[in-house]
Amino acid sequence: MADDRKALGRWGEQYAAEYLQQLGYQLIASGWHCRWGEIDLIAYDQATLVIIEVRTRRGTAHGSAAESLTLKKRQRLARLLQAYLQALDAAQTPWLGDYRIDAIAITLSRGQPQLEHFQAISIE
């Protein structure tokens, strides 16, 4: 069961990455880890650094993928963003531009992916 969830998550991240590239985002990393957790995707949207959380669900029996973006998870994303910015500083490549947190929710309905893209999500 856990392997199924991991495979679904990997599929969702790949699907989201392809979607973002079609929109013109430049993907620079995936699966970035630190002690606070993992950032699914990191990209540039023109001159803005964006970290992207991807949530993928099969059906809506336990709520939609979008509903799984709880306040606690959004606050964790804010910590992850700060950790990533600090890692850039430590690597002597500080980011001085704009940044934001996006979320992509993918719900499979009858095998068809339904994607919602939330830009600049609130952490409050």
Swiss-Prot record:
InterPro entries: Restrct_endonuc-II-like (IPR011335), tRNA_endonuc-like_dom_sf (IPR011856), UPF0102_YraN-like (IPR003509)
Protein name (database record): UPF0102 protein Haur_0145
Name of one Pfam family that matches: UPF0102
Molecular functions (GO terms): nucleic acid binding
SUPFAM superfamilies registered for this protein in UniProt: Restriction endonuclease-like (SSF52980)
NCBIfam families named among the record's database cross-references: PRK12497.1-3, PRK12497.3-3
Top-level taxon: Bacteria
Family: Belongs to the UPF0102 family.
